Regions:
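Active-/binding-site microenvironments in catalytic and ligand-binding cores
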Residues: 1-262
C-alpha cells in the first residue's frame, strides 16, 4: 500500500464500531475482512433467520446483499440474501432446514462474492471521484453486480476522448495505490469538514441520520457511504470502461468491468 498521506486538520472521528439493527449486531462494517463468526439464533420463521450477531452485508447503496451459509449440528443452511426490516432477516435457500431458536451457529460469508463486490464498490467510488474531479459531473444513479457495474452522470456533452481519458485516469489512480479509509463523524461535523461529501445529484442521506459513515479514497474522493470496500485502490485490480450510453438529455451511463486479480 502506498505511504502517501494527505495532511488533514484534526477531525472529530468516531471510532468504527459494530452497528445494531434491531436485535442483530452488525459486524461487517467495523471489520470488512470478517468472513466467519459465531452467533446464536434469535428467530427462525417464514420471514427468515435472525441472529444476535451477523457479518452478512444486507445490501444498500447499489451493493447487493451477501450470500453464505450457517453451520449448526452437522447441518448446513445456505443463505441466499438478507432483508432489512425491524430486524435483519437472513433468507435461506428454499427447502434448507431452519435452525431452532437458541441454536449456536457458525456463520460464513461467501468470500469470492463479497470480495468481488468490495472491489466493484470501491471501483465505482474511484470512477465517480475521477469523473467529478476531471469533468465536474455528479452521479445520478448506479447499480452493481460482482465485477461489473453501471454508473449514471449528469453530463450534458461528452468531452473529446472521454472514454479513454476516464480509463487512463482510473488506471493511474489504481496504480497510485491510494489508501481507502473508513471513518464515522457526527453529521454536522462531517459536512463542515467535507463540503462535497454528497457526490450524487440528489442528497439521499436520511434527514434523521445523526452519524455519517465516510469512505475516503485518500487524495481523490470522499463520500458518505454504507457499503463494504477494499483497503486500497490497487486491490480493485483494474477498471475497464466497456460502454458509454446516452440516458436522455444531459445524462450518460458508463458501464464498467472490474478486471485483474485485485
Amino acid at each position: 500500500m502506498s505511504t502517501e498521506q494527505r495532511d488533514r486538520p484534526d477531525r472529530p472521528d468516531r471510532p468504527e464500531q459494530d452497528e445494531q439493527h434491531g436485535r442483530t449486531t452488525r459486524l461487517e462494517l467495523a471489520d470488512q475482512t470478517l468472513r466467519d463468526w459465531d452467533a446464536t439464533v434469535l428467530a427462525a420463521t417464514d420471514d427468515g433467520i435472525v441472529l444476535d450477531r451477523s457479518a452478512f452485508y444486507p445490501g444498500g447503496g447499489g451493493q447487493p446483499p451477501d450470500h453464505g451459509v450457517l453451520l449448526w449440528g452437522g447441518v448446513q443452511t445456505r443463505i441466499a440474501g438478507v432483508r432489512k426490516s425491524e430486524d435483519l432477516y437472513l433468507l435461506p435457500v428454499e427447502g434448507d432446514p431452519l435452525p431452532p431458536v437458541g441454536t449456536a451457529v457458525r456463520g460464513a460469508v461467501e468470500d469470492a462474492r463479497r470480495t468481488a463486490l468490495m472491489r466493484t464498490h470501491s471501483g465505482l467510488h474511484l470512477l465517480s471521484g475521477v469523473v467529478f474531479r476531471d469533468f465536474g459531473a455528479l452521479v445520478t444513479g448506479g447499480n452493481m453486480e460482482p465485477l461489473e457495474a453501471r454508473m449514471d452522470f449528469n453530463l450534458p456533452e461528452v468531452p473529446e476522448r472521454f472514454r479513454d481519458r476516464v480509463a487512463e485516469a482510473c488506471a493511474a489512480e489504481i496504480a497510485a495505490d491510494r489508501a481507502i479509509e473508513v471513518h464515522s463523524m457526527d453529521r454536522a461535523a462531517a459536512f463542515a469538514t467535507h463540503p462535497d461529501l454528497i457526490r450524487t445529484a440528489t442528497d439521499l442521506l436520511p434527514p434523521d441520520l445523526e452519524v455519517v459513515r465516510i469512505v475516503d479514497i485518500v487524495g481523490l474522493d470522499t463520500q458518505a457511504d454504507g457499503g463494504t470496500h477494499v483497503r486500497s485502490t490497487r486491490q480493485i485490480g483494474g477498471l475497464e470502461v466497456v460502454k458509454i450510453e446516452s440516458k436522455g438529455k444531459g445524462f450518460r451511463r458508463l458501464r464498467v468491468k472490474v478486471t485483474g486479480a485485485g
